[in-house]
Regions:
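Patatin-like phospholipase
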Residues: 1-42, 50-259
């Protein structure tokens, strides 16, 4: 990183509201003059990555998250396969992006989603409208209805690739990964039901797979304190806290880098 000629890639994991920590980390990187030449993101990482690649500052990204009332009654649906209609969030993004495509972004971005029918990971091409790619990537299964693009149904990119480090392999000289989905802190008393044990087992399974990808990064920013927050935080105070946690973890890990 001391060599300014090095191209830098940034990978942003999924994580719901905890993705606000991505913005905090980007704030620190920006202050250090570290600018990515490419970005890859899924789910919450796709939202933050898309906004940043478009030109929004980390503080503006935080304010964007705070402006959305996720559980507004207008967002609920009874006709689609989800508690909330993913299409209902289009207006929030349209005010910012309009009809721009991924290829028109200031920073090249790679956004992923899961093709529910084919069961394959989709990396959207440069001609895809940014709004469509982001909404498809962040359609959390069960909570948000699948998002349709050209008669194909897509759901959260994190289903198949929660931390898409592999997408930027060979596309940059130095890779920074920001991972905002640490394992939740629990105690034995929290594992008293079939549901809780099953959920914990899958959390550990996915975590093991994602942690292996840390080896593909030159620098990993993982705010473990985020384990104390839920995936769907609605408190603006907690959103501010998550932003600060991301910033502080980036700062601490930067000081400990062996470069």
């Amino acid at each position: 990183m001391e060599n300014s000629s090095k191209s830098i890639g940034i990978v942003l994991s999924g994580g719901g509201s905890k993705g606000i920590a991505h913005a905090g980390a980007l704030q620190f990187l920006t202050e250090q003059g570290i600018q990515p030449s490419c970005i890859a993101g899924t789910s919450a990482g796709a939202i933050v990555g898309g906004l940043f690649a478009f030109g929004k500052t980390p503080e503006e990204i935080l304010e964007f998250f705070k402006s959305i009332y996720f559980f507004h009654w207008k967002h609920f649906t009874f006709k689609k396969a989800g508690l909330i209609d993913s299409e209902s969030f289009k207006s929030y993004f349209a005010e910012i992006f309009g009809d721009i495509t991924i290829g028109e972004l200031k920073i090249p971005a790679y956004i992923t989603a899961t093709d529910l029918v084919k069961g394959k990971l989709k990396i959207f091409n440069t001609e895809t409208k940014l709004i469509d790619a982001i909404l498809a990537s962040s359609s959390f299964p069960g909570m948000l209805s699948p998002y349709e693009i050209n008669n194909k149904l897509y759901s959260d990119g994190g289903i198949l690739n929660h931390f898409p480090t592999d997408i930027l392999q060979g596309r940059c000289d130095y890779l920074i990964g920001v991972y905002v989905s640490p394992i939740q802190n629990i105690e034995s008393k929290d594992l008293k039901s079939i549901k809780s044990v099953t959920s914990r087992a899958f959390d550990l399974l996915y975590a093991n797979y994602n942690y292996q990808k840390f080896n593909l990064c030159d620098w990993v920013i993982e705010p473990k304190e985020l384990a104390n927050f839920s995936t769907f935080e609605t408190s603006k105070t907690k959103m501010d806290a998550i932003f600060e946690i991301g910033y502080n973890e980036a700062k601490i890990s930067f000081q400990n880098l062996d470069i």
